[in-house]
Amino acid sequence: MAVPPRGRGIDPARTNPDTFPPSGARCMEPSPERPACSQQEPTLGMDAMASEHRDVLVLLPSREQLRLAVGVKATGRELFQQVCNVASIRDAQFFGLCVVRNNEYIFMDLEQKLSKYFSKDWKKERNEGNEKPRAPFVAFLRVQHYVENGRVISDHRARHLYYCHLKERVLRSQCAHREEAYFLLAACALQADLGEHRESAHAGRYFEPHSYFPQWIITKRGIDYILRHMPTLHRERQGLSPKEAMLCFIQEACRLEDVPVHFFRLHKDKKEGRPTVILGLALRGVHIYQGKKLEIQLDGLPAAQKLVYYTGCTWRSRHLLHLLRASHQLHLRVRPTLQQLRQREEAEEKQHYRESYISDELELDLASRSFPGSGVSSQHCPHCLSRHSADSHGSSYTSGIKANSWLRESREMSVDVPLEVHGLHEKEPSSSPRTSRSHPSTRGDSQATRQEPCTQVRTRGQSAEAVHQIQEMTAGVSEEQHSHGLDDMQLHQLALHPAPTSLSHTFHRALDCRLAGPCETRATLPSKRSSNCLALDLFGEAPPQEFVV
């Protein structure tokens, strides 16, 4: 719970400036260059008390002090405008002025007079006698509305103050189940505060652990552990600009449950002496109150079932309602900007991760050879190389051959046998002696083929018989599996587990024809599926040449 620092005296509105903030804080006194801090001349008709001014000490999230002078009848809006002018804050919609009441921060309604938030000494006249000078009235500039994306804050100065506020909240955080998040936040904070890690400058104890870690982590891990491991995490943020590191810190800090939230203590019953319930106003949510009661109706429950808590006084309920209403209205205004930023970030992520589909030149050439006049597309071509059909149109085999340097991928060959050629093969078994059904030697060769990454291609022509062995690298198979799609993985599984009927493929073709252009004659040939072999007979004058794989 957000608790103000100690050492402010009994009355938090009247505080000795020498005791707070901690040492090292910078005090910004009014000067002629800052006209917002200059005293205004009284106008005609104003009484003596209206012409007097009060000293107000405003503490910023960066531990800076602003010493301002405002009129007795000034409103919170006037003081807030002076703070923004002196601190050079242009985008101040996420900040607000608050005072401490009962050890809680109460945000001011800027339309109300300051006399309602300070003690009764505010209206007392000054005596020019020997009376000691008064201590200034203390106010705080704090983050009133949280936002998880720091890019919504357009002003650099306002973003830095927002970062300083979250950094102070992280030091008071108690999320023990997110210990690793605090080390990530510390690394981002070091990158934002100190820049790139340099071995010469950032050696030894170049940062104070108490300024970047909660006390419970320092007690649990120790200072030596933090100083030993944090330089490595700091070096990992190399290349991250201070602005990007600050935005990363804001985003990660808002993911902690007890950082972007305002806590208020409530009573569950009127008779309770001390508050027993803590209400947290987080990034989203709307609450309703009635008089001294704060009434919360949960979404999805009947109207009769309500959670009722008591604030103790009407003044607290009124200001709590004002804070809830203002937070809700602000998030409604910021929602379109957040959506645009989210879409832009998603578009940037898509540019970093793209999917590439690579196809072979042979496949593109075969796909472009479809007959426009015959009405047959390349999808129905039964004997062309295909990578996209998963069922192969009833074909029984898948052959993968690496024969040329330009053909580097295994492909599915779907070839349907013409009806007349199938009859010729049944009548003439001698023309293809290696296409016998379930031959023992064929099974032995198939097992050897599975073990050895070698393919034998036997070519028999008119005069000579040549045997070629083509070595297939297993690395090519793994590259295919990573580069192909789902269809190729199914075809690869079919190639690993072929049907046991036959492993020999016979192609009867004319000598003057080429295998690269079978689609030109396919439309005129009748086809029939064959379960034993894949045969293609292109009639010609020369005797056929047989390829056995």
Swiss-Prot record:
A Pfam family matched in the record: FERM_M
A single BP term in Gene Ontology: positive regulation of hippo signaling
SMART domains: B41, FERM_C
Residue stretches of biased makeup (Low complexity): 430-443
Residue intervals of the FERM domain: 54-369
Domain of life, per lineage: Eukaryota
Spans annotated as Disordered: 1-40, 377-400, 422-464
Biased composition range(s): Polar residues: 444-462
GO cellular component: cytoplasmic side of apical plasma membrane; cytoskeleton
Entry-linked InterPro entries: Band_41_domain, FERM/acyl-CoA-bd_prot_sf, FERM_2, FERM_central, FERM_domain, FERM_N, FERM_PH-like_C, FRMD6-like
PANTHER family: FERM DOMAIN (PROTEIN4.1-EZRIN-RADIXIN-MOESIN) FAMILY, FERM DOMAIN-CONTAINING PROTEIN 1
Protein name: FERM domain-containing protein 1
Species per Swiss-Prot/TrEMBL record: Homo sapiens (Human)
Gene: FRMD1
